[in-house]
Amino acid sequence: RAAGEVFNITNGDFFRWRHVWPKIADLFGMEAAGVEPRTLVDWMQEANSLWDELIARHDLEPNPLEDLVSWRFADYVFGTTWDVMASTFKCRRAGFLEFVDSEQVLLERLAELRTLKIVP
């Protein structure tokens, strides 16, 4: 039923970053800050030296920051000013019925990155 078909690849649930940031901050033992509109591409240009300090301070794996993140993609994801909605009807009708809680999985993956010493 799915051969030759094109599907929206989305989990189907909706979340807003403003609701997720406090949970991410809590995971890292931090207070969530307010909104500061800026592009990460510009803001993070000077982040490599800070990242090197964090690697040393927290005994992290020595991964260069540019190997871990695309600031252009992050700007796109975090800067979207509309709710992203994509129908999952077609893929469910074709039998793809599994789903996950996107917020929960995000927090689990971030916790896993901490365990692997990728992030502090």
Regions found by a protein language model. Give the residues of each.
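Conserved beta-strand edge residues that scaffold enzyme active sites
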Residues: F99, V105-L106
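Residue-level detector of family-conserved "landmark" positions at structurally sensitive sites
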Residues: V35, D101-S102
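A conserved mid-domain beta-alpha-beta active-site/ligand-binding segment of alpha/beta enzyme cores
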Residues: A74-F78
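Short, charged, surface-exposed hinge/linker loops at domain edges
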Residues: T81, L116-P120
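Residue-level "edge-of-site" marker
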Residues: R38, Q104-V105
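Mid/C-terminal beta-alpha module of Rossmann-like enzyme folds, strongest
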Residues: R1-F73, S87-F89, R93, L110-L116
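Aromatic-glycine-rich donor-binding/catalytic loop that engages nucleotide-sugar donors
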Residues: R93-F99
